[in-house]
From Swiss-Prot:
It comes from Schizosaccharomyces pombe (strain 972 / ATCC 24843). This is Extender of the chronological lifespan protein 2. Induction: Up-regulated transiently when the growth phase was changed from the log phase to the stationary phase. Belongs to the ecl1 family. It is found in: Nucleus. Keywords: Nucleus. One of its GO terms (cellular component) is nucleus. Involved in chronological cell aging. Its main location: nucleus. The keyword Nucleus applies.
Length: 84
């Protein structure tokens, strides 16, 4: 599973499944900050996931949609051009 990118929007992360709280809540709207369900937001806690959650994440992160891929590429190109 690729943990370098948010499983919701595809933005780069630092080893988390989500880039922001907003993306986390989009995937888990009923989660509170102290909810046990939300303990999977860090990659270090992946071993605690049930197979149900792992299957869900594999399906969502294995094949990015064409629009996500093109927006990631466009964002990368734009960031490289901005440096020039």
């Amino acid at each position: 599973m690729d943990l370098d990118y948010c499983i919701i929007c595809g933005k780069p992360t630092t080893g988390n499944l989500y880039c922001s709280r907003e993306c986390h809540l989009q995937d888990c709207p009923g989660c509170g900050s102290t909810s046990e369900q939300c303990s999977y937001s860090k990659s270090a806690d992946l071993h605690m996931l049930s197979s149900q959650y792992l299957d869900h994440f594999r399906r969502r992160s294995s094949m990015p949609s064409p629009s996500t891929s093109s927006s990631l590429l466009n964002g990368f190109v734009a960031s490289r051009l901005a440096v020039l």
